[in-house]
């Protein structure tokens, strides 16, 4: 993800992030299935999706910690 996209994610609400996280997990499942069957055209997409999942989880956790501090 680009820095601009990360800023947009940080400004969005947790419900939107949770939906996006679910979509990315489903995409990762499909990519892994394609990899196993030999139909995957772009193996780097798996890495990109995993990184995006980690970034969204980090943003959600930061929001949780910020809420606990208040």
Curated annotation (Swiss-Prot):
Name of the featured protein: Large ribosomal subunit protein uL29
NCBIfam families (alphabetical): L29
Organism: Clostridium botulinum (strain Alaska E43 / Type E3)
Domain of life: Bacteria
MF terms (GO), sorted A to Z: structural constituent of ribosome
Single biological process term from Gene Ontology: translation
Record's GO cellular component terms: cytosolic large ribosomal subunit
Gene3D superfamilies, per the entry: 1.10.287.310
Keywords: Ribonucleoprotein, Ribosomal protein
Encoding gene, per UniProt annotation: rpmC
């Amino acid at each position: 993800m680009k820095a601009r996209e990360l800023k947009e994610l940080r400004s969005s609400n947790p419900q939107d992030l949770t939906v996006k996280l679910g979509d990315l997990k489903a995409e990762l499942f499909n990519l892994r299935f394609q990899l196993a069957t030999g139909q995957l055209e772009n193996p780097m997409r798996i890495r990109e999706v995993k990184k995006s999942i980690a970034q969204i989880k980090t943003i959600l956790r930061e929001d949780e910690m910020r809420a606990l501090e208040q």
